[in-house]
Amino acid sequence: MTEMTETKKVEVPEGFMTGKFPLKKRAYGEEQPGIKVGPFKIRLPLIHHEWSWTEMAAAMFLGVACLGAGVTTTMTTFGLDDPANIAALGFDENGVFLMALTFGVLNAICYYLPSLLGDPVVPGWITPALPLTLKFLQQWDLPNYATGQVDRIYAMIALQMLVALSFLIMGATGIGRKLVDAVPMGIKAGIVLGAGVTAAVNVFSARMPKAPWTVAIAVLMSYFFLFNPTFARKATKSRFWNVVRNQGVVPAQLFAIILAPVLLHEIPLPQIQWGFTPLSFGYVLEHFTIFGLGFPAWSFFLAAIPSALATYIIAFSDFVLAKEVVAEATAYRPDEKVIFDASRSNLVSFLRNAIMSLFAPWVPMCGPLWASG
């Protein structure tokens, strides 16, 4: 007797990987091509993955929203909204805003590192740790640039360096991956559910009182564009509505930014100025980094150890959430194998925090996942 081995034939959809880009094609159901460099897989636009205009547009709007919040946090934490400090630095209000904007732009550039290095997540801040960071920094007075008293900046540099070191240790040793794999399913479910609850609480407690109608309508619009089955079916039949659906929460964001001030008058109408914005990397290096201020004293590092450990513990839940989200999404994507490696993700977070601690200490710090609002 002859035994016949039946091979399961995979049906490849028509038009799969037939375009000019990316130059390096992937086989159906396989991992995206990349250049293996240690734990990383370098993927370059147009070579290893195609360019998506819809995702670029969504990223621009979402990035600008966080840019504004990050710039405000930087200015208030480092005393850049104080007239005396503005005068001591030799700027006007617009000048210090551009200096603070430089922090946000460098952080936004670092958002590209996960995609570049093969980490299949959209990065963000360590948002739940922000109140702890601000409380830690309150031990030191606001910087006084006229006298050179900048202990708070030294403390922020030390804290972010220790957070970066935590990510490095957990990623390089593999402990981070083992911990993520060891988390029981019940706790994973709690983390996934908790991320959504945290985002909702943040929106309704912090932002609802300021603009209740705007927030309520924007939330309903987001749910409609993301989860409504009727709209999803309509998007499959219309190229225009498919593009709109692929923008995620951007339509709701545009409503809040543009239409809400006109129709509801709950928030001021934004003033848009077109043109190139000059940044102040030189001034940031001189006044906020080890290259201009010198290395922080060891006392700052000792004081920052508890806050750094607490920050990593908070960020750890994002690794668990990222793994579960990627696993769930992959089940609906038979065309591609997506691999989330917690060790690699830890190392990418190390690089982002290390870069920011050296060149523009970032108060919200750099987390592995964009998980809360």
Language-model-derived ranges and their functions:
Residues A155-Q160, A206-K210, I290-L309:
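Hydrophobic alpha-helical transmembrane segments
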